[in-house]
Amino acid sequence: MKTDIQTELTQALLSHEKVWANEEKTILAKNILLDLVEKTDPTIIGLLLGNDDLKRHFFVEVNGVLVFKLQDFRFFLDKHSINNSYTKYANRIGLTDGNRFLKDSSDIVLDFPFKDCVLNGGQSTEEGEEIYFKRNNSQSVSQSVSQSVSQSVSQSVSQSVSQSVSQSVSQSVSQSVSQLYTKLTRKRQEIFFNQTLAFDEIDRLFDAKAFSKFSRYTADGKQAVGEIKRHSDGTPAENLIIKGNNLIALHSLAKQFKGKVKLIYIDPPYNTGNDGFKYNDKFNHSTWLTFMKNRLEIAKTLLADDGVIFVQCDDIEQAYLKILMDDIFDRDNFLNIVTVKTKIGGVSGSSEGKSLKDSTEFINVFSKNRERLFLNPVYQKTEVNEFIKNYEDSGKSWKYTQVLIDLGEKILLEEKDGFKYYHYPNAQMTSIVKFSQDQNLSKEIIYTEYSHKVYRTTNAQSSIRSKIIEDLYSIKNGIVSIEYIPQKGKNAGNLIEVFYNASNKDMFMFLSDMLIKEKNKYFYLQKVNTLWDDIQYNNLNKEGGYIDFKNGKKPEALLRRIIDMTTKEGDIVLDYHLGSGTTAAVAHKMNRQYIGIEQMDYIETLAVERLKKVIDGEQGGISKAVNWQGGGEFVYAELAPFNETAKQQILACEDSDDIKTLFEDLCERYFLKYNVSVKEFSQIIEEPEFQSLPLDEQKQMVLEMLDLNQMYVSLSEMDDEQFAGCLNDDDKALSRAFYQAEKKDGE
C-alpha cells in the first residue's frame, strides 16, 4: 500500500517525462530521479517545492533559505522501492537516448544504468539460475490446493510404495502446489546496494572485516601464525591467501595496502556460461559489468602510482569492459589490448556455421598513472632458423647478411671524457653467402655457431653515433669503434665497445646480441608486441603439481611474462580471482610478494595445495626456467563468516523440519533483510503446501531472506556478544595485528 507521501510524490512528478520507467507512469526510474536531484535539477526541485506535503517532508528552512534534505529523500526512495535493495532496472544494460532505453527509442547512446550501484556478487551456485515464487492470494485457490494435497497424501499412504506411485503423488502435489505458488525461474538475481541509498548499510558492507582460521605454510608444513610480518614502511610483508567474497576482501585489504600493489592480474568469469570456475558465469550483461566495476574501482586504490592492471577477457564482453575500464582508470592511462592465442575452441551444434572458431582471448592493460609507468623489456623467443624462415616467407628481407671475419690490428686514436676511440684499418668482412661457400658451411650453422660474427649495419641516430661522426669524420676505411661505460640502459655500469663502418659511420649490430642459447638450441629474441601467440595453452595438466582445473588454468608462462614486464623482486602482485592459484604460484617462484583472494571452497583443494607443492619445489610450469628450488611461505586466512555460516546451515538442511527449526534460530541469531515479514513466513512454513515443495526450493526461499550486508564479521564488532563463536581469541588478536588496531578498554 502506498503511503500518503508516496502518492503525493507520484502525483507531483507526473508532468516530468524523464523520471518514469514505463509509459503508464506507474514505476519511477529511481536511478534517473536520484541523478537529477543530486544535480539539483531546477525542474525536479521545483515540482517538490510545489507540493506542501513534499516541501514539509524533504526541505528544512535555514536562515530563511529552504535546504533540500537529500539524504532523507534517498532513504525514502530506498525504503519504498520494491524489495528495497533491488532496483527497477536490475540485470539490464541499456542503450539510451538519455531518457528511455533502446527498446523504446531509435537513437543509440551507450549507457550503464548501474553506475551508482554496488554488486555484492554472492557466487555460490555454478548454474547461475534461481527459482522464486509468487503466491496466489485467491482463497478459493488455497482451498482447492489444500484438498488436492490432502487427497494426494492419503492415496500415497494407502497404496503400496512403488516408484510409479511415488512419481504420481509427487506430480499431483506439485500440480496442486503450483496453483497456490507460481514458480518462476530466472537467471540468478544479484543483489544491488545503491550507493545513493541506505548509507549505513553501505558503510557496514565495506567496513574492515575480521579474519579467522589463520595458518602459516612453510617447508616444515602447516603452522600457527604468531605475528604479522611487516616491511619497514609498515605494510604487511606476508604472502596472503584469503578466502571470502573478493569485493569485501578488497575493501578490507585497502586499509593496509592502499597504493602499495605494483601489479594486478585477474582472469574473471567471462559471462559465457562455459567457465570452469564455479562462479555464476551466466551474469546478465549489466550485472556482469557492475560486478566488474565495483571490484575494479576499489582495486584501483590498491595500485601503486606506477602500478599496472591486466584484465583478461574473451570477446563476449571485451568491448564493454574496455569502455568500463576507460571510465575507471581514464583513457589516458590505457596502454594496450594484448591478444593471446589460446587453444582453438570448436563450434558445434547450433553454433556450427554461425560463428568462427574461437582461438583468442584479450588482456586489457591500464596503468594507474602512465607518466610514472616503466615496463621492463620482455622478449618472445623463436628458434633462430625458424624465425629467419618465417621472416623471409613473409616477404621481408633478412638484414643479418654480413660476416666479420677478423678485426685485425687495433689502433687507439684518442681518449677523452671517458671515451676511447679505436681504428681497425685491416678488418676483413664478407657476405654470408661467400663465407658459406669458402667455409663449406650451411647458413643454419653460421647463424648459430658463428652468430657472434654475423652482423647488419644501421644508421639509427644516437648521441654516441653523433660523436663518432664528428670526432672521426676523416677516417673512411675499415672499422672504427668507441669504448665507454654507459650510465643507463641494459649495459649500465659495464664497459662496452661499439663498432661502426668507417666509410658511412653506420653502427654494427651482431646477431648474437639477439640470441639466447638454451639446451644447445639458439633462439631469436624479439620484444613482445600485442600479439602473444607463442605461449602454450595445451597440456597444462602438469602445471601446479597436477592440480586439476580443466577450463580455468592459465599457463604459468603467461603470468611470468606479465610479472617480468611489470615488477621486480619484492614487489606486490594481487589476483582477486585466484582460481587454481597460477598467479600466486608464479609470483612465489619469482620472489614477488603476492595476495590471492578466492571465495569458493576449492581454494583449499586447489590454490593452497598448489602453493604447498611450490614450497616443496615442484618442477612444473616455469620452475626450470627460473631455477626454482622450493622454499618460502604464505599465510592463509578467511574473512570471519556470520550470515555466511547461516547460508551453509540452510544448505545443509535435510528436510522441512530442519528448515523450520533453523528458521527460528535465524530470526534470533542472524541478520535478515529488514523488509522480510518474519511473521508471515512463520505461518507459511507451517503450511502443507510449503512443506510439499521440493527441499531445494524451500531452501532457496529461506536463503533469499539473509541480509548480504552481514555475511562477514566487521573488525569493529567482533567482540560483540552476537558474534560469539565466530572467532576465537587468537583470530581476534591477529585481526587487530593485521589492521594495527588497538584493543579497546574492557575487551
Swiss-Prot record:
Q: Which InterPro entries match?
A: DNA_methylase_N4/N6, DNA_methylase_N6_adenine_CS, N4/N6-MTase_EcoPI_Mod-like, RM_Methyltransferase, SAM-dependent_MTases_sf, TypeIII_RM_meth
One term of GO molecular function = site-specific DNA-methyltransferase (adenine-specific) activity
EC numbers, comma separated: 2.1.1.72
- Give the matching SUPFAM superfamilies: S-adenosyl-L-methionine-dependent methyltransferases
| Record PROSITE patterns | N6_MTASE
Q: Which domain of life is it from?
A: Bacteria
Give me the ranges of the annotated region Binding of S-adenosyl methionine. Answer: 267-270
Alphabetically ordered keywords of this record: DNA-binding, Methyltransferase, Restriction system, S-adenosyl-L-methionine, Transferase
**Record-level GO BP terms:** DNA restriction-modification system; methylation
The record ties this protein, via Pfam families, to: N6_N4_Mtase, TypeIII_RM_meth
Q: Which reaction does it catalyse?
A: a 2'-deoxyadenosine in DNA + S-adenosyl-L-methionine = an N(6)-methyl-2'-deoxyadenosine in DNA + S-adenosyl-L-homocysteine + H(+)
Q: What does this protein do?
A: DNA restriction requires both the Res and Mod subunits.
PANTHER family tied to this protein: 4FE-4S FERREDOXIN-TYPE DOMAIN-CONTAINING PROTEIN, PROTEIN CBG11839-RELATED
User: What does the subunit comment say?
Assistant: Homodimer, also forms a functional restriction-competent complex with Res.
Family (UniProt): Belongs to the N(4)/N(6)-methyltransferase family.
Protein name per its UniProtKB record: Probable type III restriction-modification enzyme HindVI Mod subunit
Q: What is the lineage of its organism?
A: Bacteria, Pseudomonadati, Pseudomonadota, Gammaproteobacteria, Pasteurellales
